[in-house]
Amino acid sequence: IVRNELRRYIVENSKIPVVSYSFNERTSSSTLLTRLEALSTIAKRRELMAREVQVGITMGVDSGSSTTKCVIMKDNEIVGTGWKPTTEVLKSADDVIAEALAESGLKMSDIEAIGTTGYGRFLIGKHLNADLVQEELTVNSKGAVYLANAQKGFATVIDIGGMDNKAISVNDGIPGSFTMGGICAGASGRFLEMTSKRLGVDITELGALSMKSAGGEDVPMNSYCIVFGTQSLVNALAAGYKPEDVAAASCHSVAQQVYEQQLQEVDIKEPVIMVGGSSLIQGLVRAMGRMLNTEVVVPHHSQYIGAVGAA
């Protein structure tokens, strides 16, 4: 409580953003760079981040660890989207751009400005001669509150990604405190991908399967380490638990880890907005809502959140 109050006091009275680390987190050089970039962005680009309306024709490309996304916006409306698994960074980007252009009916020459974000932002930014190359913490928070119609006041953004997770406390569209990372891939969307493969369903079907269960809290599940988590999956199925209960238990385990490791590090305010591809897994959203005792908001186009923020 004291830590949260001190953090809130610093943010509200000094306008200095606060980045948090959980005590058990193993921070990599890439996540440290992202954090430092975010602090710099918040300090230097507050006016840009405070914009509430998109104008003209712009494109955002989000090169994530698992998927690459593209969004084209025209006068505050999404007119084109593209999505595909990340393989070769530049080829994946070119493919999703082609998809978005085809859907929008526009040509590359029609695009007035380009923004890139995600792990491949620098490479793609150079490839496209982008006008904005920005880390995903500030970009995702902006995209989240924009799509959730929560640009005024407080909000909490949760993004459970393929390699790391982000929890961001936002006020008037600008992050105040945030944390990023996790101990192991067992606490990320990667574990849910592994769960779906073990259950013989596509990751896009895992959410519907998990919702057939009451919650799966009674299924022993340890995803603190992805190796032990895999063993838990095998043991649960061998013990006769139904696939839907195992799916729900995996969602509950990931939500619990994010809550224990990261959501203690930010000041949680409603609305709580879940974004990213994992937000389409209904069982995970349900588990997070139960963990926080609130109704979690999943906006339309939530899987394109980084691309929307970049655009």
Please provide the spans of the model-predicted regions.
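An N-terminal assembly and electron-transfer interface module characteristic of large anaerobic redox
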Residues: I1-M59, D75-E77, G82, T87, ...
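Conserved phosphate-binding/catalytic loops in two-lobed NTP-binding clefts
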Residues: N13-T27, D131-L137, G289-V308
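Gly/Thr-rich phosphate-binding beta-strand-loop-beta motif of the actin/hexokinase/Hsp70
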Residues: E52-E77, F154-N171, G215-V219
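Short glycine-rich, Thr/Ser-proximal phosphate-binding strand/loop in the N-terminal lobe
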Residues: G60-D95, E99, G176-I183
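Glycine-rich phosphate-binding loop plus the immediately following alpha-helix
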Residues: T86-L90, D172-K212, T230, Q303
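Glycine-rich phosphate-binding loops at beta-strand->alpha-helix junctions
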Residues: G118-G120, S253, V266-M291, H301-G306
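Adenine-nucleotide phosphate-binding core of ATP-dependent small-molecule kinases
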Residues: G229-E260, Q303
